[in-house]
C-alpha cells in the first residue's frame, strides 16, 4: 500500500502469487514496466469493467453523486473491437548511457527509458517503423549530438500517412543528414523538426520545419480528411473518436460547443451534422490547423475562438457539448 486514504487506497503489485481469472498473457514483455499500457495484463472485458467501475467511483467519491444519480448518468461503455494495434501515435524518449545514445519508451518510473523495437498498441500497418526509426537515429546519435528531446511517430492505416517528428531546441541541426538517413530507413510521408524553447517544464513551440515529404500528417475520421502539424493533438484511437461522435448523435437543428477542440477532431464532424458550432482552443498550432481543416472541408458554420476554454466559454446554451 503506497497511499491509504479515507475513501480509497493506492498500491503497487510486487509479486503475483496466484493470477486471477481476469489476467491474460499480454503480447508484450514490458507490461507492468512500460508506462504506456498498465492495463495490458487484463483481458479486454476486464479492462472495460474496471474502467467503468473507476468512473462510477470517481462520480461517487469526487462528484458526490448518489448511486441513483450515477446510474442515471452512466451508459454502457462503447468500445472498439481491437484491444491492440489501435494507436496512431507513439512517442520515443532519448537517453545516453555509457556514452551510447538510444531511443526507447518511458517506463512507469519516468526516469527509466525502456529499449523497444515494437509496440503492440501501435498501428500494425507501420509496425516496423519504431525499430527502423530507433535504429537510424541511434546510429546518428552515436556520431553527433542531435539534442533530441523526443521523437513522435504518427501512422494512419486509412490514408497510409506516416510522419516522423523530431523535437529539438532551436539552433543548428544537421537537416540534410537526418533527412537522408531517416528516408533510407523508413518510407515516411513526412519528416519534420519541431523546435521548442523556454524552461524545461514550460517549453513552447518556436517553429516547425519540414525535412522531407509533406510536412504534415493526414488522417480520415468519418468522412473528414484532416491535415495536422506535428505539435497538434489528435485522438490516438481514431475509431474510438468516431464511436464518440456517433454516441452524441448531433442533429441538423442543434448548436454544438467543442471545448479544447484541438485541430478539429470533433469540430468537423459536428459541423457537418449540426446547424452551428463554437470551437474553443488556446494552442496556436492547433488553431491554425483547425482553420485550415475547415477551409479544406468547406465548412463555414463554425466560430473558431482562440483562447482558454474557461475564459472564452460561449455564453450560450448548447444542445451538444
Residue ranges and their predicted role:
Residues 173-321:
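Rossmann-like S-adenosyl-L-methionine
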Residues 1-209, 221, 225, 242-245, ...:
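SAM-dependent transferase fold signal centered on methyltransferase-like domains
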